[in-house]
């Protein structure tokens, strides 16, 4: 096998690994309850594949804190991340209720309708409301 064939084989292997890493990224990871900031993150593998995920943590003061935490995780998997926006989530597991609203001052407003669709993959039995009201 010549050097070009080895390089090509190696690149295919790396691409396959990043595709598998992307497939393993959960769509939703949010705090189990409370009101907290969230971000939508577009995660990309080394090729053309990508997916949008939702992250929100009560222990993060700023939207950027959430993004930076998750970006490090994705980098370790060989993935790239971008944040198109954020907002807030109210999570009441007792009532099986999620409310998505507001915006991020740093990243802008996420597409709350898309956020709702993504949240519904993890919380199919919840009532999920979206609103453009509030911060």
Swiss-Prot record:
One of the GO BP terms on file: sex differentiation
Instruction: Name the Gene Ontology molecular function terms of this record.
Output: protein histidine phosphatase activity
Record GO cellular component, one term = cytosol
Alphabetically sorted, this entry's keywords are: Differentiation, Sexual differentiation
What single Pfam family name could you report for this chain, choosing any that match? Ocnus
Where does this protein hold substrate? Answer: 37, 104-106
User: InterPro entries attached here?
Assistant: Janus (IPR007702), Janus_sf (IPR038596)
Q: Identify which residues the record assigns to the active site.
A: 63 (proton acceptor)
Q: Report, as the record phrases it, the tissue specificity of this protein.
A: Somatic and germline cells. Isoform B is expressed in both sexes and in somatic and germ line cells. Isoform A is expressed in males and is germ line specific.
> What is this protein's function?
JanA and janB regulate somatic sex differentiation.
**PANTHER family (UniProt xref):** BCDNA.GH02250-RELATED, JANUS-A/JANUS-B
Q: Can you tell me which family this protein belongs to?
A: Belongs to the janus family.
Q: What else is known?
A: Transcription of janA gives rise to two sex-specific and one non-sex-specific transcripts.
The name this protein goes by in its record:
Sex-regulated protein janus-A
The species is: Drosophila melanogaster (Fruit fly)
Q: Which gene encodes it?
A: janA
């Amino acid at each position: 096998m010549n050097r070009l064939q080895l390089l090509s084989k190696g690149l295919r292997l790396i691409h396959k690994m990043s595709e598998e890493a992307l497939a393993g990224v959960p769509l939703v990871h949010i705090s189990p309850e409370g009101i907290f900031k969230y971000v939508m993150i577009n995660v990309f593998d080394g090729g053309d594949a990508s997916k949008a995920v939702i992250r929100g943590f009560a222990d993060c003061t700023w939207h950027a804190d959430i993004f930076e935490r998750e970006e490090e995780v994705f980098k370790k998997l060989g993935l790239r991340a971008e944040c198109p926006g954020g907002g807030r989530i109210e999570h009441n597991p007792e009532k099986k209720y999620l409310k998505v609203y507001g915006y991020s001052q740093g990243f802008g407003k996420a597409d709350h309708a898309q956020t709702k669709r993504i949240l519904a993959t993890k919380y199919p039995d919840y009532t999920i409301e979206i609103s453009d009201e509030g911060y």
